[in-house]
């Protein structure tokens, strides 16, 4: 389950890719084959529209807790999920580690940026 406490995020981010690979790797490989097939591509698009909506709603719930706008959090979630799914399908440790490192640095930079704006009383983006 996704964390709602910022203190739990680091543990979650470290564990989820490996848990996802173990729990869902085979299923993701099958879904990839099916949803990229021309006969089923429209079903795949609909599936991912729902995924996009769910992650956006989650980002909106996180915004007041971590102080980063949901419009910034949402693409970070997408990068995280893509890295997890890619790892689950291909067990590509290099891809996973590089994506996680850029996410870690990105979140820290965004947190500093929006904390500074908040302290200055501004909302400039």
What is each PLM-predicted segment?
Residues 1-23, 77:
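Hydrophobic alpha-helical connector segments
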Residues 2-3, 7, 32-38:
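Short linear capping/connector segments at secondary-structure termini
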Residues 11-15, 45, 49-56, 100-104, ...:
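Generic alpha-helical structural signal
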Residues 19, 23, 32, 39-67, ...:
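Amphipathic alpha-helical packing segments from all-alpha helical-bundle domains
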Residues 23-24, 90:
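Residue-level recognition of alpha-helix termini/interfacial anchor residues
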């Amino acid at each position: 389950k996704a964390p709602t406490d910022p203190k739990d995020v680091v543990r979650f981010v470290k564990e989820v890719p490996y848990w996802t690979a173990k729990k869902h790797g085979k299923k993701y490989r099958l879904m990839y084959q099916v949803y990229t097939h021309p006969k089923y591509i429209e079903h795949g698009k609909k599936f991912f529209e729902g995924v996009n909506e769910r992650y956006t709603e989650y980002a909106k719930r996180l915004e007041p807790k971590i102080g980063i706008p949901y419009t910034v959090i949402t693409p970070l979630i997408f990068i995280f999920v893509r890295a997890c799914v890619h790892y689950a399908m291909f067990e590509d440790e290099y891809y996973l580690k590089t994506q996680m490192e850029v996410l870690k640095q990105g979140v820290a930079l965004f947190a500093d940026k929006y904390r500074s704006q908040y302290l200055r009383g501004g909302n400039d983006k």
